[in-house]
Amino acid sequence: MLDTKFDELMEFPSSFPFKIVGDASDTLADRVVAVAQSLAPDDYTPITKVSSKGTYNSVTIRITVTSKEQIEQLYTQLAAIEGVKRVL
């Protein structure tokens, strides 16, 4: 697991923003939502932006998290999506 201090800095449950940057793809947002649904079922409306050259997409999604471990799982699984370069 990751060595984070989310439990010291946050109160749970909390709405937590994730920004995922990946290769330009029409399905990136759908894959991000699928991971979010698997760990924190809810209705999600991700915001997708395309980079100025069209090379990358960024997807921002707010997820209600209930624990430090859940945040760490989300970071790990979102980063494992094919084509993802960064999870912020």
UniProtKB/Swiss-Prot annotation:
Coiled coil: none annotated. InterPro entries: UPF0250_YbeD-like (IPR007454), YbeD-like_sf (IPR027471). Pfam families: DUF493 (PF04359). GO terms for cellular component: cytosol. It comes from the Bacteria. Belongs to the UPF0250 family. This is UPF0250 protein Shal_3239.
